[in-house]
Swiss-Prot record:
This is ATP synthase subunit b 1. One of its GO terms (molecular function) is proton-transporting ATPase activity, rotational mechanism. GO terms for cellular component: plasma membrane; proton-transporting ATP synthase complex. F(1)F(0) ATP synthase produces ATP from ADP in the presence of a proton or sodium gradient. F-type ATPases consist of two structural domains, F(1) containing the extramembraneous catalytic core and F(0) containing the membrane proton channel, linked together by a central stalk and a peripheral stalk. During catalysis, ATP synthesis in the catalytic domain of F(1) is coupled via a rotary mechanism of the central stalk subunits to proton translocation. Component of the F(0) channel, it forms part of the peripheral stalk, linking F(1) to F(0).
Amino acid sequence: MTHAPHSEVAQHVAEAAADHADSGVFPPFDPTYFASQLFWLTIAFVILYIALDRLILPKIKTTIEDRRDRIADDLDAAAQAKADAEAAGEAYEKSLAEARNKAHALAAKTRQTLDAEIAKETAAVEAELSAKQEASEAAIRKAKDKAFAEVRGIAATATAAVVSALAGVEVSEADAGKTVDGLIKAKEA
């Protein structure tokens, strides 16, 4: 029993092969099978279309939308980062300008303070030097006056001695001093 169906199938295949061999046309290009081939081709394309439409295309569409959203989010994040960087740069420039202005103001204030201290110290030193100069000039005048007084006394004594030695006349030191004083006043004028 098992051999009977096998032999029937084999016989049927052999008959079909003989029919085809007699026609001389390649079976897929045989016009008698076109209707059947078109039917199965249509069914295969419908199944392929449904599979693409229901399974594959939604996944591709979702992937493309996710990628587009991710790119848009990345662009938004980049724009935000750029805006933040620009704001930080502006804040840095502003704080740098403020620090520079504060430094200039502090330098000017310090310069004014130092100039005032220097002027004060200079005035004190000048006053001290002026006082020392006046004291020195007074000491010099005193020494000069003392020296002149001594020179006057010596000149008066010398004059009295010279007149006495040369003229043989005795002159008092007081008279000789008056003569020396007159000569000194005449020379100063």
